[in-house]
Amino acid sequence: ASCLVGSEMCIRDRSFLISAPLFLGFAAPLGNWVAKGMTSGFAWLFTHAGPFAGALFCGIIPLTIIFGIKGWSAVELQNLEVLGHDYMLPNFFYSNLAVSGAVLAWALKQKPSEQRSAAISTGLVCILGITEPALYGIALPEKKPLYAAMAGGAIAGASAMLMGVVTYAFSMPGITSIATYVDGGNNFFKLLIVMAIAWISGFVISFVMNKKEQ
């Protein structure tokens, strides 16, 4: 029996050693290609269909974080250099707030437990711009908070593009970076409105979707 177990482990180890490099060699270039394609596509959409682009982009941000799709910084930095402002980076802020609201609403429907405590703490951390613990720990396993966060983000993204909210510097998409939205006009006050829309939308949608734990 021990020989059989040892043989099975040996086969699995060999399979892993063969398949892992093949997977990484295929997945890494594919992920890079997908990221470049999405970046170019959204850059075009934001130029030609602002509110729709805002809704779509902000709505899928949780998925891009979960799957590790990156590459937006190049467009954001180019916008800041050429235009003096950027409209893509703020969407990550709105999405973070929507995730916060969705996860905290889910926590309110749960009985006291370690998972509920984790949801509250990670939901609050989202406001600072760190969503991975909330996404991987609560939203993705529970599904409904993820859907609510995506819906809330979409609403906020469309609202922001309709109001023309932009950032004037590259920064962490969290509450500590709100000074980068200050200008001589009312951009900052529009930001506050979109922030409220993002958090409240994520919270309300999640609260309605999730049943109270008995």
Name the predicted role of every residue range.
Residues 7, 30, 34-49, 59-63, ...:
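Hydrophobic alpha-helical segments of integral membrane proteins
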Residues 79, 133-214:
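Transmembrane alpha-helical segments and their short flanking loops
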Residues 26-31, 49, 64-72, 94-97, ...:
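Short helix-coil transition sites and intra-membrane helix breaks within transmembrane domains
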Residues 57-70, 83, 106, 125-128, ...:
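Transmembrane alpha-helix interface/packing and boundary motifs in multi-pass membrane proteins
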Residues 77-153:
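Helix-loop-helix junctions within the multi-pass membrane cores of secondary transporters/permeases
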Residues 11-14, 42-56, 84-91, 111, ...:
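Membrane-interfacial loop-to-helix junctions in multi-pass transporters
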Residues 3-10:
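Short, small-residue-biased leader/transition segments that mark boundaries at the very start
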Residues 15-25, 58-63, 98, 102-105, ...:
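Hydrophobic core segments of alpha-helical transmembrane domains in multi-pass membrane transport
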